[in-house]
Amino acid sequence: MPSVQAPRLEPGGDPAGGLGTSAATAPAAALPEWCPAWAERLGDAYLSGTSCVFLLHGNVRDLVPIAAPAAAAADPAAWGTVSDFLAREMFGRWDVVLAYDVGKGLRPLAGPDPNRLRTMAQWLTERIGNAATWPRDPDQAVAAIDAILERNLIDPPEQRKRIAVVLDYAQYLAPAGEAGSRSAASRLVRILGWATNPLLRRVNVAVVLLADTISEVHPRLVQNPAISAIEVPMPDAAERERFALA
């Protein structure tokens, strides 16, 4: 029996094949039952046009299903990280999924598709140089992401890319209590700028921050109405059993 693929967030596509036609007007399409509830909340928030920046917090380190139950029960590879799920399912048809954390630096996320990975890497190389020079420093990395998003805005519409950004360990990018330092304040202001930029909400851009504990993230991000904070809960008994059988 073939696995059921989750509808991807696809603002430029057909609602029947993805989650709507535009960030502002598309109706939300129901995700399959096997998809996490937090994913449906993220999709609904994006498609409503109220936000393009999201903060996933809580149980963001557990493996999550990235295939239908029939497949996941027999294949451990049908489970992946939250970042895997975002790259393969939520943004599986987007042109670029760019991830960053302070440990691994900037990198494209393309799931298991090598052709998609090469295409992403080539496009990113044209924008920010050879992969060997991509910044690991958080200030430089956030500045590079900002430059990518700004360049995408001024590109002709037919050349614009659908870009998703996944910022893991967000508590180290915008930590609570550290906005007094110049570098931390700069990163915070850039992220807030993405959330409140009406132009970004009109093109195909989504930024997802992952944090283990919401209290460790700067309150300016947590409390901003333009940022959708979504809790990722601990798995229930049925989910734990499903994983144990994989």
Enumerate the language-model features and the residues they cover.
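ATP/nucleotide-binding catalytic cores
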Residues: 1-246
